[in-house]
Amino acid sequence: MLVLGCLQCFTSAWGFASRRICHSSSATPGQHSVGLGHGYQHGAQSWAERFLLRYKGLLWFVGSRAHSGGEETNGKLQAGGCYSYWRGSLGIYFERGKEHGEPLIITKVEDGNKAADILMAGDEIVNINDQQLLGYRQEAICLVKGSHKILKMIVKRRNDISYRPHSWHSNKLIESAMDTVTPQMSNASPFWNARYRSSSSSHDLSNPWDQTSLQRNSGHFSSMGSMDSIDQTYQFGRLSSAKSNNSIDYVGSQNKRDSAYGSFSASFSTPDHTLSKTASASTENILYKNNEWDNTKLGYGKTSPSMNEVRRSADRQVLQSTSINETSKIQRTEDNTEPRYSGRSNFGPVWNIPDKKKTASPPPPPPPQRSDSYAVTKIHEKPTNLMHLDASSTQHFNVANRSQAKPDWSLEISEQQRPIRAHDRTVADTRRTSNSSYHAGLNADQGLSPYKDKYPSNLPNVSRIQASLSTNDVRFAQPAYNYHHQRQYSDESTLFQSTRTSAQHKSQQQPMKYESSVNQVPSDLTYVYHPHQFRAPATSAGFSSGKQNVENNGQNHFHVVSIKHPQGNTTHHQFKEEENYAPEVNSGRKSVQPENTVISIEIPAYSLPQESFEPSQINCEKNYLKISEKKDNYLGNNEQIINKTTGYSEEKCNDRFSQLDHSEKGSYRSSQDYSWRKEENKITPLVTPMLHSLAQEGRNRSESFPDTGNEKLSFPDAGKQSRRSDRFATTLRNEIQQRRARLQKSKSTAALTESNETETSDNWKQDSLESMSPTSEGSFSSTYRSHLQEAQARVLRATSFKRRDLDTGISDHLSLFQDRNMQISSFSGLSLDPVQPKKNTAVNSSQNVSRIGARKRFTTQQKLMSYSEPEKINEVGVEDQYNFRTENSTKRTVGSFADRWKFFEETSKCAQPKVPPKVVSSSQSEETSEIAINRDYAKSSEGQESKRALAVSGQNPADENGFPDKVTTERRQRLGTFAEYEASWKEQKTQLERKNSGRCHSADNILDADLEQNPKAQYIHERSKSSPTTDFYAQAAAVESKQQSESVRRDTENSNSTHCRSSTGDSPTRTVEAGDQCGATNEQEVLTCNTKWKPHDKSFPIPETSNESQQSRARSGTLPNDYRFAHENVNQGNRDISFSAVPISEACPDFSNADSDQLQDHPSVFKKRSAAPQRPPPPKLENKYWRQNGSSSSLATSSESLLTAQARRAQSYSPSSQDTFPPQSLQKQSPSTYPDKNPSIHIYDYQLSVPPENDRYHLEKKYFESELSSKSHLQIPGMEPSRSPSPQFAPQKLTDKPPLLVPEENLSRIERVIDNTTVKMVPIKIVHSETHAEKESRHNLLSAIEPTALPTGLAKDQLKTLSTSEQSYSRFCAYTRQESREEEESRVTDLYSCQRNAEDDNENDVSSLAPSNAKSKDAIYADLKSEELVREIVDKDKSLADILDPNAKMRTTMDLMEGIFPKDEHLLEEAQQRRKHLPKIPSPRSTDDKKDEQNVPSAVSLTTSSTYYSTSAAKAELLIKMKDMQEQQHIAENSEDELGQNLSEKKQELIDSISKKLQVLRDAKETLLEDVQCNNALGEEVEIIVKEVCKPNEFDKFRMFIGDLEKIVNLLLSLSGRLARVENALNNLDETVSPEERKTLLEKRKLLTRQHEDAKELKENLDRRERTVYEILANYLNEENLADYEHFVKMKSALILEQRELEDKIKLRESQLKCLTDSLPLDRIK
């Protein structure tokens, strides 16, 4: 608490160390040295110094002009810096001012002072920082200290430069009055001090500058008060400086600068208390007369000058409309748009900004000061309600918490100060908006505030409501977003309407206050850009306040304030109209609605035509709201309070309420303050007749206008003032307790919602409860937030990205819904008000959320696109749901398509923040159908979510009840995975939709989400980057192939010549059976393909149907879903065509198969469909990648899916190559070409029946021989989802996918050759990596599988790798022999390159394929042999069991990472491809070279192909095991006698094998490092681009996300590794281990598990941030750069994981090698 009287000493309680400012010894008692050097003896920094330290800037003494017979010195004093300047001591000494009944004169200016040249002793300080002084020294000191960068002093100087007599001071006139007022204010002064904010306007200051006022001012202007209010005000209120228009926000810490800025400069409108209530002719004076001091109390006089202006305007208007006798004065104020500061009114407005009313006012009207611009900015940023709300709520939370935390008025001061700071900004804006109206509002506020202070009941409301609605009213912490300035009302501020609405409601809550607001708002009647994008006339606030005023009856200075147009005249005129009209309005409103009645405010949302406005039954009036049909004439904006108020108005009201709720927090503080004040300052007809009437009016309003939204804020607070006066603090406490109880009830989100609803009702019922909320506000805020946070955490865990599930989101959504409901209700007649208020209530503490829209000044599109708005995140799903609920009504409500669109955006902002619903290409319609189908399919899983997705999706463009995005929304929402989400991003910006899956898409999540997503994402996602599940689901839905995949398709018919109709669709493209599946199997599947191919459709005319499915696949090709889809396709193929794996890539991948050239030609397509790798222009990679997408997706369905399916199935068939071939050939063909060619490739469907033999692993060779028309037919072996082709076929795809890639590569080569021949049928070597066993039986996977003998040597290609364990272990099909596979893969890689060359050369590389197959077979056998060796060695040397067969028991780091980072090997392939594309990377060796090098260690081959490294560690281990097992088998074949003798030999053999594998791993690691380097380089490029195009704050988000991505991945890996080690230790504990040791391990495991879960939550949050960043970047980056970004992000984590995996594998191999070596006799060691 600051003692303003003399500031002899004061201790700042504002969180700083005690600061004392004492009269310097050099200064006379009447003087005060502002200079810090001399300014305080105690050596503590004064607030001024601290402030200056914090806000470094230049000091300026500005302005000289003749004035009042005296010469106003216009001195510009520019100091090098405030700090140094002040540090050196300002050296200006003020003689006592009004405190001593004397003018405030500079008695001394130290020599050498920078001001010495300008200032002279005897100068009377008239204005500081545009704040007219009442003449109080403390006021001047506070203002000086509060100055931010500039110290602007206007001094009156007699011509003779001698001290002027005090009489010269204009305040002299009012001194008596002030003295008189002071006693009146005395009881309030303590409150004032506490509440008085430095940010309060000069008007407010005028009040404070009474002795009482001074006390208040001292608190108000004191560094503590001002700083406190400053910093705190915006901490939450200004959630984003970037969004905030306030200069302070932009400048830096909103709180700091804002506070300092707003509270000291803008807010610091030096109160003109000098003007006696009688002497002051200005409205504010009148208002002061009415309740000048009271108002000041309410406003703390510290409301920013803009608030003062508003207050003045309000005063004028209020006085006019009010019974206040000062109507004439108001008019005069009207004339003087800027209310003259009492006593100082003669002096021109501190601000040089001409006010609209300025012209009228003889003295230059004080335009909003810095704080004004500040306020405006803030205001824009926040809803009017939020101004206070921000201060009290979101700041809110800070402010509310702090202030709430502070029970006393001093706390309240800080709280209010904060709000006031927000207010200051708002006020400044308001002031800027309409000085006169603003001032009128302020005056009204001031008028009210004293009484309110006296009568806390009103005050709490006032604080919420903005003490007299004047944004200036500091006490009421008027919402920063009260737009008193047009700018404030401009669309700039998203929250504008809400803010204004809040203000209005607040105004309504407090008659005086709202009067001010009304004046202010009406002045600024400009349509506000509602946070919900609903623009309502600023007048609506005015109306609300007007209503309240009406309720207040004559005393209520209700003025329907015309919208303050940018033109001051208009505003002026409107104000006059208001003045004239106000009585009518009052009477009319009163007549229309009882005192309690609240006039719903017509706020055209979205600047909708008035006609579109629905009468907004203010949800605030939960119970009922009488809408004044009276159209305020001053509402030049055609804004009519009348029922025309649109649902948006209702929404605004809701927003207001929610904002008010935020304000309520401040109000609660205020209430507390008020409560004690009300005891001291009880509003009574005798003591405070005006306030009493206002209170009565407010009470009536509160009664008539139940606080639905403002449960805390409760408009009834005005009415409550009387009640509170009756109940006082007791009632408040009771209310607080009740509110707390409610909060507790609402601990759960659902509970919160219900509580909020209940509270809303209760609030309406119990205004007092709302009143008591001041105390509970903070608790509510904190408790509510904590509950919300907990709920959010729970929900996030459960729902991942389903923000709608977040309770907080619910609250927000409720607010939005409320708004919409209000619209709907008003529009449809639904009585949503009660519910909405409830929602608002729920949101109240978290009203920050309501600010969601308002915070941002982003355009609607930006808002839609910005997930960066945390508030809106929660709103994503809820709004969608709500939209559906209120879809019809909302549609009705929304007037035009644009409106509907805006509304939709608003509702689905979270879901698709930035992306307007896009209609996809022609295939989109199909997709729509697909979506419908998928929707049906997904509905089972998604249910309402899919509906929301539909709402979001462009499916229902605008025609769907004005929800153009309805379908789109559903689709987006369907996106189960972030990858799909990303895909949707790329494919359709409209599709930006929050991911259903929460955190990284675990395989499970992906699957589930994808099922839903597939329908919506298929066309939505150009590529489901990380969510193959989309395809999988589409497939599952279409074919139910999953179920079939459950059953092993052992009987795969020889591939039927299946023709997949490519985009041309006329000619069946050889899609193998996949084509049929895509085209015929299922619409969804086809749709999926089509979706997948849609991107391709752009480049390749593929039947949209198939394209859809393929697009999904293509997109998901890189994703597990693709694999799953392929898997499903395989199943489908079996069902439909006995085609297994090829479906995706081949069915639809004609495009994939299209020549790499085409791919190159259409890199965008690739980009869309696949992750970055696709983007890379190199057709080969892309082709491969596409084929990979298609085939791997089909053949190598997500490894997880496949593994799962494989585990399910005893056997799996994975002809990876088969898919690959057709797609590539198709790719080779131009879209038109291949259709024309109508290549029908029949891939022989080889059925691998691999009986798993647990004990022995032997390859059972099944040759499915069918004549191989290498060029006539490619027979695709029906393969289980374990369509993992032999590694040789997927040299680049290290996993199953690689095999797919390899087959694709092979196919590509073959097809390319064939394609060269047009409709060439290319024999496709199909490598079935047939693994049916689960991980557990991975080592048992050695069921013998021999490649079917293909006539063309495809049989070799058809080699089926049986590495069940590996396959199960990894998503990738296990390769029978790692080594062989490596060789095979290297061959495949070579073959692939050869194929590429063949494409170019039209050479047929089939021959090369055969060698590759042979190599693959050799590799498989080698692996099997190795596995056998391992088994044999383990059988004979148990000591080596654990190390040689770790998978039996051991858990690996990657096991624990499973699901957290859905593994997409396509990414690795992409990385490799990118790297290979780099000039520095040599192209794969030619097939011939490979053939020559067939004997080269497989490690070399593997290294070349990078397949091995791409293979998961588990996979590698499996391969090794298999190989070892083969060796063991061979050993087993030896007689037992020989075993003993040959054991060492076997060990040596195994050592050799492991050594080779180890070398391969090391080579792979090197390759991986290259990939990492390439990816990092890409990231740097992306970063440079992002930095250039994005805003600094957005770039920071990007950088932080990238940095956190690596950190979180490493954290998860570290924790997973540690946890795996602990679990392995536990699993391997001997029975003899002591219980203590076991307990220790168990505790470690528990701790690590908990930490691991926490890390996973971080990952989920990171995923959300990733979406946010993506949305941001999507606004700036082109598709290619965006694809680069996506690829970089994906690869960053993927490479980290892969690197860790390789390291683990290397360690394992090294340990195995070491153990084996150690176990060998010395003589046997080589």
Curated annotation (Swiss-Prot):
PROSITE patterns: ASD1 (PS51306), ASD2 (PS51307), PDZ (PS50106). The ASD1 domain mediates F-actin binding. It is found in: Apical cell membrane; Cell junction, Tight junction; Cytoplasm, Cytoskeleton. Interacts with F-actin. One of its GO terms (cellular component) is cytoplasm. SMART domains: PDZ (SM00228). Keywords: Actin-binding, Cell junction, Cell membrane, Cytoplasm, Cytoskeleton, Developmental protein, Membrane, Microtubule, Tight junction. Residues 318-328, 746-755, 769-785, 1054-1070, 1104-1119, 1209-1235 have a biased composition (Polar residues). Residues 79-159 form the PDZ domain. May be involved in endothelial cell morphology changes during cell spreading. Required for eye pigmentation. In the retinal pigment epithelium, regulates the biogenesis of melanosomes and promotes their association with the apical cell surface by inducing gamma-tubulin redistribution. GO terms for biological process: apical protein localization; brain development; camera-type eye development; camera-type eye morphogenesis; cell migration; cellular pigment accumulation; ear development; establishment of melanosome localization. Residues 1427-1721 form the ASD2 domain. Residues 788-877 form the ASD1 domain. Its main location: membrane. Residues 329-338, 657-667, 936-948 have a biased composition (Basic and acidic residues). This is Protein Shroom2. Residues 294-373, 425-451, 657-676, 697-785, 913-968, 1007-1080, 1092-1120, 1166-1240, 1269-1299, 1471-1499 are annotated as: Disordered. Residues 917-926, 1191-1205 have a biased composition (Low complexity). InterPro entries: ASD1_dom (IPR014800), ASD2_dom (IPR014799), PDZ (IPR001478), PDZ_sf (IPR036034), Shroom_fam (IPR027685). Belongs to the shroom family. One of its GO terms (molecular function) is actin binding.
